[in-house]
């Protein structure tokens, strides 16, 4: 695999993860403020655990980016 392919995939994955974390946080804030139009079946604790896992994974990707000297600014170009 070429480094460029690896880098592109890593940046895409990171960008998508950041977007999903943001959307989950918005969802949880709406839930906490009673602004949802439905009642989620899974417990709030499960969603909190999911957010925690996603943030941990984001830190792993950031570590890989730093190790491979991939600039966070490059995420904007993906």
Segments (PLM) and residue ranges:
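Extended, charge-rich alpha-helical interface modules
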Residues: 1-78
């Amino acid at each position: 695999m070429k480094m460029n392919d690896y880098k592109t995939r890593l940046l895409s994955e990171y960008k998508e993860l950041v977007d999903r974390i943001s959307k989950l946080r918005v969802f949880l804030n709406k839930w906490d403020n009673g602004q949802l139009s439905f009642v989620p079946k899974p417990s709030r604790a499960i969603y909190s655990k999911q957010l925690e896992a996603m943030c941990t994974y984001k830190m792993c990707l950031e570590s890989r980016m730093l190790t491979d000297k991939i600039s966070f600014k490059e995420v904007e170009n993906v």
